[in-house]
Amino acid sequence: MTTFTNEELKTIAEKGDKLIVEKFTTLNSYKDILEIFNIAQVILYGEKATLFELEDLIFYANLNFSEKDRYFTFTVKKKSGGKRIINAPCEELKGLLQCFNYILQVLFTPHAKAMGFVRERSVVSNAQLHTNKNYVYNIDLKDFFHSFGRQWVKWALMQEPFNLSGEREPLAFWLASLCTHSLEIEGSTKIVLPQGAPTSPTLTNILCYPLDKKLNGLAKRFGATYSRYADDITFSSNKSIFKNEVFLKELERIVKSQKLTINEKKTRLQKKEYRQEVTGLIVNEKVNTYRHYVKQLRMWLYYIEKYGMVKAEALFRKDYIKEKGHIKWEKNPMKNVLQGKLLYLKMVKGAEDATYLKLVQRFDRAFGFDVEAILKIWEEEGIQKAAALYSKAKPKKLIRYNKSGFHTVLTEEDVTT
């Protein structure tokens, strides 16, 4: 059974990501890969980490052994209609890939204009690059994840900063095999990146670095701004360059040179006088959500306020979950979905935005306030800050459950005196 000594755990805690860099530089065997995966596991999960065994890596990296056991398939609805097929790894493989994904992100810095699945970048930072422009030009890359085969992934791992070349080339192939899967693509079987594997987005950022560099150079040449969020590429400019034959031909040439294909059906030129959208956000003047997004939040909060939680939850399950299809049948899905939508709204509009603040106050009234949050602020920032936070929501009762199952009901007087 694989274990770390107390001294080794202390070293992992002290060095963290630096230890991953050190260990990857000297990677020479499958046992070395196992060690670095387990280091990542400890960094990610601490005391809860369950260390991998070499047999796990060998099994899941060998398609002959594990092809039928690696992935399960499901579909999700697209906003534009139709369905998207997702190939998701089984739990054991998912754990391995999450650790390798962390390792890849430690070792590799994506291009500055790669905005998807990168720490401290998001759909918001992507959209911000294209605000208040006369023209916004969107293109989509066809069958994006499935365009990257195992050999291409192996090649990338042989380059800087991974350098698994020469005598270490078999390790590059082994890791590439771990991250790819045999899928039927347009009538033929190919070993490619699955859409649903934790490593696939990061690996596409690695593999698309030359594409990002060339397209960013093209944008600069024509006085435009470029960015890419996964398969969604955006150019924006105040000049009318997007009907320029030289620009369009060079764009197509660069994409084809990287063995990728533009999905012509999804190419859009958006002018200032009409609504301009980038990665699901409006960018005409500033980054904003669709009106429908806020309208839907208000609707569900209104249902809670008017009909009560039980009926509102029933309406939510009937309509929203039916629409999305892939949402899990959780104990309280409405609360989780509304929380997620509010966090997204906060990310887009900012924590001080009036619309966000009003909606979050209604949410707190509807679901009850987080007593632990108040008490933490009370301890760290004083009673006045805690009272101010409480007064924004004004729930009827504040309930905190202890380990024995008993609860304490705090009134407004308890908090403010």
Q: What does each model-identified segment do?
A:
Residues 80:
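ATP-binding glycine-rich loop module of kinase domains
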Residues 141, 230-231:
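Short acidic donor-binding/metal-coordinating loop in glycosyltransferase active sites
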Residues 225-228:
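Short beta-strand
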